[in-house]
Design a protein with these regions (language model features):
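Glycine-rich phosphate-binding loop of actin/hexokinase-like ATP-binding domains
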Residues: 127-185
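Glycine-rich phosphate-binding loop and adjoining helix at the ATP-binding site
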Residues: 38-46, 50, 61-66, 72-131
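Glycine-rich phosphate-binding loop plus the immediately following alpha-helix
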Residues: 13, 109-113, 167-203
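Short glycine-aspartate micro-motif
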Residues: 3-7, 62-67, 108, 132-136, ...
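A mobile "lid/hinge" subdomain adjacent to the ATP/sugar-phosphate binding pocket shared
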Residues: 18, 185-244
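Short glycine-rich, Thr/Ser-proximal phosphate-binding strand/loop in the N-terminal lobe
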Residues: 2-43, 47, 80-83, 157
Length: 245
């Protein structure tokens, strides 16, 4: 029997088919369609799952469960995405939508950093740990906390979510509507923003050359590659990023 793990990100939905030994035997990645909302997201998860199962000569009858994680706050019952700003999900009944696609197959919904920490606890760097913390750095910033060998969710289900804690008073605009959040400085989104600014200030930089000076062409990979190649503008972006982190 198999299980499916799904990571809904700000740009892609990453999926993995897991066997009984908890080893990933097949992967799938599909674009996240922000305009499609929760309903289209559930359809994409179903389509990707069928494709992975088919690659193994299997079908839904071989599927034990579906685990889905999102970069946002989940209600204590694990049913509703209260807020996931980078997905434009607000009080989204995501579990019910996904459950509708899979019928009687159990569906579980959790915060992405909590899911990552739990995975490390069972088969990763946290095996045998009683206390551990994990931070996810991507489109946003998330955190997962293990206390006493168990996942800590907190009274409101936010657990160790620090992405929207205040870092710089009156600072950069965040996707949540506030200013100065950790996420506004320590995410891939922040790297792209700062790389564009650096590129515009230094037209002789690799950042400018590799994007042809067009902001819409900038992404985190270009910024990282330029920094690795010694571009002073890109290195300054990452020095600031690390300082804030």
């Amino acid at each position: 029997m198999y299980q499916v793990g799904v990571d809904i990100g700000g740009t892609n939905i990453a999926m993995g088919l897991v066997d009984e030994a908890l080893d990933v035997v097949q992967r799938e990645s599909m674009p996240f369609e922000i305009k499609g909302g929760g309903e289209r997201t559930a359809e994409i998860i179903h389509e990707g799952t069928l494709a992975m199962l088919k690659s193994q000569g299997a079908g839904l009858y071989d599927l034990d469960s579906v685990g889905v994680v999102v970069p946002g706050s989940i209600d204590p019952a694990g049913s509703i995405v209260i807020n996931a700003y980078n997905l434009n999900f607000h009080n989204e009944l995501l579990k019910a939508r996904i459950q509708k696609q899979f019928g009687d197959i159990p569906v579980f919904l959790a915060n992405d950093a909590d899911g990552a920490a739990l995975a490390e606890l069972h088969k990763g760097a946290f095996v045998g740990c009683r206390t551990a913390v994990l931070f996810t750095l991507g489109t946003g910033v998330g955190g997962g906390l293990i206390l006493g060998g168990r996942m800590f969710h907190g009274g409101l289900g936010n657990g160790c979510e620090l992405g929207h804690a205040l870092l710089v008073s009156g600072g950069e605009q965040c996707t949540c509507g506030n200013k100065g959040c950790i996420e506004a400085y320590c995410s891939a989104t922040a790297i792209i923003r700062d790389a564009i600014r650096a590129m515009e200030k230094q037209p002789d930089s690799l950042l400018f050359e590799r994007t042809m000076g067009k902001p819409e062409r900038m992404n985190a990979k270009i910024a990282i590659d330029c920094a690795r190649d010694g571009d002073s503008a890109a290195l300054e972006v990452f020095h600031n990023y690390v300082d804030h982190l």
